[in-house]
Curated annotation (Swiss-Prot):
Function, as annotated: May act as a transporter of organic cations based on a proton efflux antiport mechanism. May play a role in the transport of chloroquine and quinidine-related compounds in kidney. Plays a role in the regulation of lipid metabolism.
Protein name per UniProt: Solute carrier family 67 member A1
Family to which the UniProt record says this protein belongs: Belongs to the major facilitator (TC 2.A.1) superfamily. Organic cation transporter (TC 2.A.1.19) family.
Keywords annotated in UniProt: Cell membrane, Disease variant, Membrane, Transmembrane, Transmembrane helix
Taxonomic source organism: Homo sapiens (Human)
Superkingdom: Eukaryota
């Protein structure tokens, strides 16, 4: 194995893998992703309280959330292209520095001596560059073997689960004990440490030698990070539009439900804030287990096509049950199936889309994939609110069944192609 691995590293420049070994870089990437996600969910737990303290009503808070979603939606593909051109080190460092700016502005907004409302809205601006998870996915994609990739990407779900659980618990506990400003300051310190570790320990690039051969010559024209035509051209590659459409369509019903979940938990389930937090922690724990353990085992026994069809089929079953649920206990019974479908769909479609593009474009494609959730967070409050107000909770189950039945028929009529991984 060592002899086979040696040629793979010979083409790399000294600044690439010399800082840490391959496995150490992957492990550090997991730690950095978990740190950033923990800070992000700490921020999610304090922003509603801060906005209420500053006198914002529900409409203004909706504008605040929409602003963050739009900025992440627009910034995702551009950040991915930046990661492809400038490398993993620059991408992760930039993401952590943007997060640092956000948390510093958030801490300043909680100060009575400063214009809190303006600073709160200004704190949303760095969100355009906060894309640590896609950058981590790019590093793991570049450094993991093709057969190990679904499991390696799935283990990022452990990081997400850690972020949901620790971030929610730390945010609420610190706000109660030390005030709103404390979580923001702690998150700023953690992201500063993340920026330092990214700059000093992550390789300048994780791409293979063949990718470098495609780079522009010194003194020649360099492709722009903001070249939207180059970004959009990836969506016109063979099979990419269909895979991407499946990803967006199947995510849409669940995304609408999760955007409205805070309201549904209060109005429909009659939960207190602490109880809703416990339910989200349960959701995060299941996601950790599913992405960290279950998907890795399944991917070693079944093809991506089979797993994709299975996730859509489980979505349909969950949608049917969701249309009839009447209590939080019923929802808890549905959560394992919902989490399995959501995690499997995202991991498998991400893996398929990565295989469909060249190694020099993996970051851009992952940035496009990362824009799906901001898109749902942007449109979700309006569309989900209209559906909930007009038809109630069962409508989310009906929409889930209808859309995923169509997706399953498409997958059955024209199976996804089985691609071999690109030569590095």
């Amino acid at each position: 194995m060592q002899g086979a691995r040696a040629p793979r590293d010979q083409g790399r420049s000294p600044g690439r893998m010399s800082a840490l070994g391959r496995s150490s870089v992957i492990l550090l990437t997991y730690v950095l992703a978990a740190t950033e996600l923990t800070c992000l969910f700490m921020q999610f737990s304090i922003v509603p309280y801060l906005s209420r303290k500053l006198g914002l009503d529900s409409i203004a808070f909706g504008y605040l959330q929409t602003t963050f979603g739009v900025l992440q939606l627009l910034g995702g593909p551009v950040f991915g292209r930046f990661a492809d051109q400038r490398g993993a080190r620059a991408a992760l460092t930039l993401s952590f520095l943007a997060a640092l700016a956000l948390y510093l502005l958030l801490a300043a907004a909680s100060s009575p001596a400063l214009p809190g409302v303006y600073l709160l809205f200004a704190s949303r601006l760095p969100g355009a560059l906060m894309h640590t998870l896609p950058a981590a996915q790019m590093v793991i994609t570049d450094l993991s073997a093709p057969e190990e990739r679904p499991a390696a990407l799935g283990r990022l779900g452990l990081c997400f689960g850690v972020g949901v659980i620790l971030g929610s618990l730390l945010g609420g506990t610190l706000v109660s004990a030390y005030g709103i400003q404390c979580p923001a300051i702690l998150a700023a310190l953690a992201t500063l440490l993340g920026a330092v570790l990214s700059f000093t320990c992550i390789p300048a690039s994780t791409k293979g030698a063949k990718t470098d051969a495609q780079a522009p010559l010194p003194g020649g024209p360099r492709a722009s990070v903001f070249d939207l035509k180059a970004i959009a051209s990836l969506l016109r590659l063979p099979d990419v539009p269909r895979i991407f459409l499946v990803k967006v369509a199947s995510n849409c019903p669940t995304g609408l439900f999760m955007v409205m979940f805070s309201i549904i938990s209060m109005d429909f389930f009659q939960l207190e804030a602490a109880q809703a937090g416990y339910l989200m922690s349960f959701f995060g724990l299941l996601q950790m287990v599913t992405q960290g353990l279950v998907i890795g085992q399944l991917s070693s026994h079944f093809s991506e096509e089979v797993l994709l069809r299975a996730s859509v089929l489980v979505f349909i079953v969950v949608g049917l049950a969701m249309a009839w649920m009447s209590s939080v206990f019923h929802f808890c019974l549905l959560v394992p199936g919902l989490v399995f479908s959501l995690c499997t769909l995202n991991v498998v479609t991400d893996s398929m889309l990565i295989k469909a593009v060249s190694t020099s474009d993996t970051g851009t494609m992952l940035g496009l994939c990362a824009s799906v959730q901001p898109l749902l967070r942007t449109l979700g409050p309006t569309v989900g609110g209209l559906l909930y107000r007009s038809f109630g909770v069962p409508v989310f189950g009906h929409v889930q069944v209808a859309i995923n039945t169509l997706v399953l028929l498409v997958l059955w009529r024209k199976p996804m192609p089985q691609r071999k991984d690109k030569v590095r």
